Amino acid sequence: MSEKIKVLFVCLGNICRSPTAEGVFRTMVAKSGWQDMFHIDSAGTAAYYVGEPPDRRAQKQAKARGYDLSKLRARFISPQDFKKFDYVLVMDKHNFAEMEKVQKYCKDATAKLQLFLDYHPDKKGQEVPDPYSG
């Protein structure tokens, strides 16, 4: 098999939006039988919750929809992620701007940095609201 497609989802604390996106995407990929084709992860632009599981409310809502986030743990973004991943998908414009700053510290960065909703035909350029802080 050829090289895996590597996708990183990013939000502020990595406890609500990005782990939810990771969990949903993992499930969709697995249901399609493509799990061997992808490496999927999530991270935060702030190190508030490193090592902690997703927020209990995010887990509850995900579980109600058939997604399990319980094994995920928050981590802090690294400049090296821009070499490791093909796509870095960010939930909002503030964190996108932070990621642009981080990307500058990664020599030979290859990842494509985009807003997550740029992949939705009707929501290009829009943000995923932060349910944790309103």
What do these predicted ranges mean?
Residues 87, 93-134:
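Phosphate-binding/catalytic loops
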Residues 18, 92-93:
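Helix N-cap/beta->alpha junction signal
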Residues 53, 90-91:
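Short alpha-helix boundary/capping motifs
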